[in-house]
Amino acid sequence: MTINVALASFGMSGRVFHAPFIAQHPQYHLYAIVERHRSDSHALYPDAKLYRSVNEMLQDPAVDLVVVNTPVQTHYQYAKDALLAGKHVLVEKPFDT
């Protein structure tokens, strides 16, 4: 079974840590990336769907797992929204402040 993963952000951690790991792991598929203003991810991951908001991405029924790698003050709300949307969630530390 392949797990469709969505990154909530393509900042430093998304670009340097999360996306490369997900893209190389045989059980994960880098399915979607949220970039609010830019489209930097498209050059590196052209098959990933691009969303402009986390809420828009959460509406996609194909997303299985959401990596919440956004600014700390958004972790709680995005994780809660993803769980309520029926997604599995991985949250970067710290979970909240």
Residue ranges and their predicted role:
Residues 1-45:
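N-terminal Rossmann-like dinucleotide-binding module
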Residues 65, 71-72, 76-97:
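Beta-strand-loop-alpha-helix segment that lines the small-molecule cofactor/substrate pocket
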Residues 57, 66:
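Receiver (REC) domain switch-region micro-motif
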Residues 47-48, 87:
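Short glycine/serine/threonine/alanine-rich loop segments
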Residues 60-62:
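Alpha-helix C-terminal capping/helix-to-coil transition sites in glycosyltransferase folds
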Residues 49-53:
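Short acidic-hydrophobic, aromatic-tinged amphipathic segments that line or gate anion-handling sites
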Residues 32, 64-65:
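Short, Asp-centered acidic motifs that coordinate Mg2+ and/or phosphate
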